[in-house]
């Protein structure tokens, strides 16, 4: 994981992310299951699914356009990266973008009600495990709708 201010490229530490309630867990690969199960138990994540995006994904550009629209959710957004890489952009307390590059072995938790967006890296490939407290769902509330 690497994070930095989008405009200035100034590095952002894990502690700075924690200060805005974005949580990061480095996961041991390939033996991640025990740690993942522990995090799920501690945080009440009862459901999970997997999503794969790559150049062969039907309507990839349309999906990425939706993901890159600035939005928030009523629930946390939890992603554990199994393969590939992507960028989460989150807003800090001063409404500045922080870019977070996630890749294989990274688990990130974006808190509920935090504006963010997502896109793939230049490789255009990611395989992620999505974790949920209830039934799997992804309902964005776009910023322009507020």
Swiss-Prot record:
Cofactor section: Fe(2+); Ni(2+)
Pfam families found in the cross-reference section: ARD
HAMAP family recorded: Salvage_MtnD_euk
Binding site for Ni(2+): 71, 73, 77, 116
UniProt similarity note: Belongs to the acireductone dioxygenase (ARD) family.
Coiled coil: none
Pathway stated in the Swiss-Prot or TrEMBL entry: Amino-acid biosynthesis; L-methionine biosynthesis via salvage pathway; L-methionine from S-methyl-5-thio-alpha-D-ribose 1-phosphate: step 5/6
Keyword Endoplasmic reticulum carried by entry: no
Species for this entry: Heterostelium pallidum (strain ATCC 26659 / Pp 5 / PN500) (Cellular slime mold)
A GO BP entry: L-methionine salvage from methylthioadenosine
Function summary: Catalyzes 2 different reactions between oxygen and the acireductone 1,2-dihydroxy-3-keto-5-methylthiopentene (DHK-MTPene) depending upon the metal bound in the active site. Fe-containing acireductone dioxygenase (Fe-ARD) produces formate and 2-keto-4-methylthiobutyrate (KMTB), the alpha-ketoacid precursor of methionine in the methionine recycle pathway. Ni-containing acireductone dioxygenase (Ni-ARD) produces methylthiopropionate, carbon monoxide and formate, and does not lie on the methionine recycle pathway.
Segments traversing the membrane: none
Keywords for the protein's UniProt record, in alphabetical order: Amino-acid biosynthesis, Cytoplasm, Dioxygenase, Iron, Metal-binding, Methionine biosynthesis, Nickel, Nucleus, Oxidoreductase
Taxonomy of the source species: Eukaryota, Amoebozoa, Evosea, Eumycetozoa, Dictyostelia
GO molecular function: acireductone dioxygenase (Ni2+-requiring) activity; acireductone dioxygenase [iron(II)-requiring] activity; iron ion binding; nickel cation binding
Official protein name in the record: Acireductone dioxygenase
Catalytic EC class: oxidoreductase
Subcellular location as annotated: Cytoplasm; Nucleus
Residue numbers binding Fe(2+): 71, 73, 77, 116
Catalytic activity, EC: 1.13.11.54, 1.13.11.53
Catalytic activity: 1,2-dihydroxy-5-(methylsulfanyl)pent-1-en-3-one + O2 = 4-methylsulfanyl-2-oxobutanoate + formate + 2 H(+); 1,2-dihydroxy-5-(methylsulfanyl)pent-1-en-3-one + O2 = 3-(methylsulfanyl)propanoate + CO + formate + 2 H(+)
């Amino acid at each position: 994981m690497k994070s930095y201010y989008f405009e200035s490229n100034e590095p952002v530490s894990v502690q700075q992310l924690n200060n805005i309630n974005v949580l990061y867990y480095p996961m041991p690969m390939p033996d991640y299951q025990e740690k993942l199960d522990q995090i799920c138990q501690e945080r009440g994540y009862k459901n999970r699914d997997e999503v794969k995006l790559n150049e062969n994904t039907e309507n990839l550009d349309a999906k990425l356009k939706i993901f890159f629209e600035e939005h928030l959710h009523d629930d946390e957004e939890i992603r554990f990266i199994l393969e590939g890489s992507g960028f989460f952009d989150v807003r800090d307390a001063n409404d500045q973008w922080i870019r977070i590059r996630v890749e294989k072995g990274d688990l990130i938790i974006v808190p509920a009600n935090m504006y963010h967006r997502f896109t793939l890296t230049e490789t255009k490939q990611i395989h992620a495990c999505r974790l949920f407290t209830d039934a799997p769902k992804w309902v964005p509330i776009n910023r322009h709708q507020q």
